[in-house]
C-alpha cells in the first residue's frame, strides 16, 4: 500500500508485551504450525465460530490499535501477531473459508530480513519492516524464512473492503513480485499441490 508505519514504535510496544502471551500457535493449525501467534482481535478459525472482538493483548499495544482502527480506512476483523522462527516454512496454501472471500488481508511487517520471502500467485515478495502490504490469501501463498537464526514478525489483519481501502489498493505498486526458482523449490519441496487448511 502507498502508506507506511513507525516500525520502531511498533517494535518497542511489542517488546514490552508480557511474555505470557507468547509460546503458542494461538489456535492456528495445519500449515501454520511453525509460527507462534498472539491474537489481538478475534480467534483462529480452527477455534470455531467465536466473536471478533478485542483480545487482552491489544490493550497493551496502543500504537498497534491505532494502526488497526485508524490508519487502515476499513472495519477491522481478525488481527494477530505472527512470529515465524528462523529456518521455518509456511507451506503454500489457499485460505478457503467463506470469511476470507469477504475480507482483505493486510500485512504489517514488524521485523524481517533479506532471507524472508512471501510467495503469492507464482511470484515472490520481500516485505520490509514499516511497509504495509495487501495479500491475496484466497490465492496460493506461503512464506520461507531461509535464515536459521533470525525470525520474522508480522501483524496480520483482515478488513472488510471499503471504498477508501479499495482506493489505496488501486494506488499500490503491483509490479514488485519476482520469480525465484530457489525459493519456490524450498517452499514446495518438490510438490505442486497446494494445501487447503
Spans of model-derived segments:
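Short secondary-structure subsegments characteristic of cysteine-rich extracellular domains
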Residues: 126-138
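Extracellular structured ligand-interaction cores
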Residues: 76-79, 103-107, 115, 140, ...
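Non-heme Fe(II)/2-oxoglutarate
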Residues: 1-72
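A short beta-strand-loop-beta hairpin characteristic of the jelly-roll/cupin
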Residues: 109-128
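Conserved short histidine dyad/triad with adjacent acidic residue
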Residues: 81-99
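Long hydrophobic alpha-helical segments typical of transmembrane helices together
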Residues: 160-197
Amino acid at each position: 500500500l502507498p502508506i507506511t508505519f513507525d516500525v520502531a514504535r511498533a517494535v518497542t510496544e511489542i517488546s514490552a508485551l508480557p511474555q505470557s502471551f507468547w509460546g503458542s500457535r494461538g489456535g492456528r493449525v495445519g500449515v501454520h504450525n511453525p509460527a507462534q501467534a498472539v491474537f489481538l482481535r478475534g480467534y483462529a478459525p480452527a477455534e470455531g465460530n467465536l466473536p471478533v472482538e478485542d483480545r487482552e493483548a491489544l490493550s497493551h499495544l496502543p500504537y498497534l490499535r491505532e494502526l488497526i482502527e485508524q490508519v487502515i480506512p476499513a472495519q477491522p476483523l481478525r488481527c494477530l501477531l505472527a512470529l515465524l522462527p528462523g529456518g521455518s516454512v509456511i507451506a503454500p496454501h489457499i485460505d478457503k473459508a467463506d470469511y476470507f472471500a469477504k475480507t482483505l488481508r493486510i500485512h504489517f511487517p514488524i521485523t524481517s530480513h533479506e532471507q524472508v520471502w512471501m510467495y503469492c500467485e507464482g511470484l515472490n515478495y520481500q516485505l520490509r519492516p514499516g511497509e504495509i502490504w495487501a495479500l491475496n490469501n484466497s490465492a496460493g501463498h506461503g512464506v520461507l524464512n531461509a535464515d536459521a537464526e533470525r525470525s520474522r514478525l508480522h501483524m496480520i489483519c483482515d478488513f472488510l473492503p471499503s471504498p477508501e481501502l479499495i482506493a489505496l489498493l488501486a494506488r499500490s505498486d503491483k509490479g514488485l513480485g519476482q520469480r525465484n526458482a530457489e525459493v519456490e523449490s524450498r517452499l514446495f519441496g518438490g510438490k505442486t499441490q497446494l494445501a487447503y487448511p
